[in-house]
Regions:
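Acyl-donor (CoA/ACP) binding surface of acyl/acetyltransferases
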Residues: 1-27, 31-37, 71, 75-185
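A short helix-loop-beta-strand connector motif used in the catalytic cores of GNAT acetyltransferases and
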Residues: 59-73
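Short, conserved alpha-helical segments within structured domains
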Residues: 45-49, 70, 141
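Hydrophobic residues in alpha-helical segments
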Residues: 32-33, 42, 64-65
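Conserved GNAT-fold acetyl-CoA-binding loop/helix
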Residues: 39-59
């Protein structure tokens, strides 16, 4: 059974994962949500202006009223007010005790282990909350995301053909990974 705790601050040696706040809008827009390269393999289009980002943030912040919301801002410890990415449970199935994880990071910070470090912490936290299975997917043309999942111990489960649409409305194949709580025992 899941004991929902919501989005709590989590820190490692290099990063802080924390709830988003309204002051994050400009850094979000500047660092990743308006970047076509960052959003290339995602289902949502780059934000066209700061107002789109503010509307997105408003929705996310209101969702924190529920303990069933898990959505973190990724920041470096040395600059906790500059949000460089996001990670969270984009879908939760309480009956099956499962969560689906999504993440996004400013390209300036790619290949530095930041998402892997963040994902490891989120996996641990969600299993502590009582989740049994945590899964993640990536566009097959984005193998770097799959490397993050593997690095965090997630197991490759297969390719789902034409299972999602990208931000241009085109169907694409996804690679699916998952980690079970029992995998850690």
């Amino acid at each position: 059974m899941i004991n929902h705790k919501g989005t709590k601050c989590i820190s490692t040696e290099r990063i802080t994962l924390r709830p988003f706040c309204y002051d994050d809008a400009e850094n979000m827009f500047k660092n990743w949500v308006n970047d076509p390269e960052v959003t290339k393999y995602l289902s949502w289009t780059p934000h066209g202006n700061l107002n789109v980002t503010k509307e997105c943030l408003d929705t996310w912040i209101k969702a924190y009223e529920s303990d069933e919301n898990y959505n973190w801002a990724i920041t470096l410890k040395e600059s906790p007010n500059e949000v460089i990415g996001s990670i969270g449970a984009v879908f939760i199935d309480n009956y099956l005790e499962q969560a689906h994880i999504g993440y996004c990071l400013s390209k300036k910070y790619w290949n530095k282990g930041i998402v892997s470090e963040s994902l490891k912490e989120i996996l641990s936290y969600l299993f502590q909350c009582g989740f049994t299975r945590i899964e993640a997917i990536h566009h097959v043309l984005n193998p770097a995301s799959g490397q993050v999942m593997k690095k965090c111990g997630m197991k490759f489960e297969g390719i789902l053909r034409k299972a999602r649409k990208d931000n241009k409305g085109e169907f694409f194949d996804i690679a699916q990974y998952a980690l079970l709580k029992t995998d850690l025992e």
